[in-house]
Amino acid sequence: NNSLNFLGKVNKGLFIDGSEDKVIKLKSIITLLYPFKNINVVKKFIDKDNLNSIINDRFHNDDEIDFFSIDVDGNDYYLFENLKVRPKVICIEYNFWYGPDVKCSVPYDKNFTWEIGSTYSGASLNSLCELAKRKGYYLIALESHCVNAFFIRSDLKNNFEIIDNIKYFRTPKYY
């Protein structure tokens, strides 16, 4: 999970996961490695209708979120579309199986569950980049496993190289 990489760099954070096992493990990691940080871990299934209220319950309106990761193996596009806060950086999982040119996402289904091994999930990188531009974000990086895209808020874009999603699109080397 990309978010774990940022635990050492932030003092305040929120992790939301629907898996009891993952929540227990994450709480143990935070307690062991980062006991003095204000990191909340919430066990809850998120959807496009409850995402903002979960965030608002834990952050004040004037709190600026530095990093926000969306990785739900399905409804990522719709969560991003409905996200009201404006973090500096957003990391979103995309489905490389759709290729570089296609703009698509699985239809919204509050109860969507990704089946391990299935290529049917999430959204194409192209569709997420289009949505990001509408929301005032720009693509700055694709991680090496070809499943996470990093977007920077428009007021910070001059500090980064904006990349072209089609030019930089890759598929993982293990496929």
List each model region and its residues.
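SAM cofactor-binding core of SAM-dependent methyltransferases
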Residues: 1-70, 96-99
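Rossmann-like AdoMet/SAM-dependent catalytic core
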Residues: 2-5, 9, 54-56, 101-175
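Short acidic catalytic loops
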Residues: 68-73, 90
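Short, catalytically relevant binding-site loops at active-site mouths
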Residues: 74-76, 96-99, 147
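A short, conserved alpha-helix within the catalytic core of class I
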Residues: 74-85
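Conserved beta-strand signature within the Rossmann-like core of class I S-adenosyl-L-methionine
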Residues: 87-95
